[in-house]
Regions:
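Gly/Ser/Thr-rich active-site loops/lids in small-molecule metabolic enzymes
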Residues: 151, 161, 165-209
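Catalytic core of DAGKc-family lipid kinases
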Residues: 93-169
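Short glycine-rich anion-binding loops that position phosphate/pyrophosphate groups of nucleotides
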Residues: 10, 68-70, 93, 177-179
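ATP/nucleoside-binding phosphotransfer catalytic cores, i.e., glycine-rich phosphate-binding loops
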Residues: 130, 135, 143, 148, ...
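A residue-level signal for conserved active-site and pocket-lining positions in enzyme catalytic cores
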Residues: 8, 63, 67, 89, ...
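ATP/NTP phosphate-donor binding region
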Residues: 1-61, 65, 73, 102-117, ...
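Short glycine/serine/threonine-rich phosphate/pyrophosphate-binding segments
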Residues: 14-15, 69-74, 180-185
Length: 281
């Protein structure tokens, strides 16, 4: 069996955790595959170095070493090749990367023995028809004004029916997985990661009545950047790909057909993460 490792050079500066993972996998007869660009820094290990896409294709699972952002950076490649992901957390929070460094011996032993589950996570698909822009997001799709000097007007429709109009700095549409990220910071609810829903959260709305709204995952949301806006707004998916929308243009958000599998060892991992990483902060 082979596993592809995707370390974050900034988080694991000396590759000490990466080396530990390689050694532990080797103890269980598992080959660690890494991108060949890392060969010079890990040449003294038992890892196998290949071009990244080739390594991904040969691997049964993917292990990211960094934080939630590290997992998000490789998520699209994992999705394209249907590879489940285990995240090792070296970051500050770790809602996606739920394996802590001290848990590596136990959890990698369970991985080798096949004693784990793959939890499918819903993703969002964002479409901007006017720009032929199509993106998939694991956490969220965000619309935000290019000008920070004044709020923008956004109108939201669900399956073509008017829902609400917001005058706000922006609007976040998040998956249950992403509900603990930017949406939470903007006052959105924490959703069960397995729930078939999505949440729309306004950012700094100029209203006492603007509240987050939860929709079924089967719905189609359309957010219109109103023609009365003084400037364009931008849409982004997981803070990566970006598209500028002119006043009057719209963005459509649906639940993606694809799902990303996260490797878990306990069905209550999300709730333990909420208790330890949010409630105690």
């Amino acid at each position: 069996m082979s596993v592809f490792l995707f370390p974050n050079r900034i988080k694991d500066t000396d590759f000490s955790v990466t080396r530990q993972v390689i050694a532990l996998l080797d103890q269980h007869g598992i080959h660690a595959l890494l991108a060949d660009e890392l060969a010079g820094e890990l040449v003294d290990t038992k890892a196998v170095f290949l071009p990244q896409q080739q390594a991904l294709a040969q691997a049964k699972q993917v292990i990211t070493i960094g934080g939630d952002g590290t997992l998000l950076r490789i998520a699209h490649d994992c999705l394209a090749q249907s590879k489940p992901v285990l995240g090792v957390n070296l970051g500050r929070i770790g809602f996606l990367a739920t394996c802590e460094v001290e848990e590596l011996p136990e959890k990698l032993a369970r991985l080798a023995a096949g004693r784990y589950t793959i939890e499918p996570r819903n993703l969002l698909r964002a479409d901007a028809p006017a720009h032929n822009w199509h993106q998939v997001a694991m956490n969220d799709v965000v619309l935000f004004g290019n000008s920070r000097l004044h709020p923008m007007d956004y109108t939201v429709y669900c399956d073509g029916a008017f829902v609400s109009r917001y005058r706000s700095d922006g609007v976040i549409i998040a998956t249950p997985t992403g509900s603990t990220a930017y949406s939470l910071s903007a006052g959105g609810p924490v959703l069960d990661a397995c729930a078939a829903v999505m949440v729309l959260t306004p950012v700094f709305a100029h209203s006492i009545h603007a509240v987050p709204l939860v929709f079924s995952a089967s719905r189609t949301l359309t957010v219109v950047a109103e023609a009365t806006n003084r400037d364009s707004v931008y849409a982004s998916a997981d803070s990566h790909s970006r598209c500028d929308l002119q006043p009057g243009e719209s963005l459509t958000i649906t639940t993606a057909v694809e799902q990303l599998g996260l490797i878990t060892f306990d069905e209550t991992e999300q709730f333990r993460a909420i208790e330890t990483k949010l409630m105690r902060r």
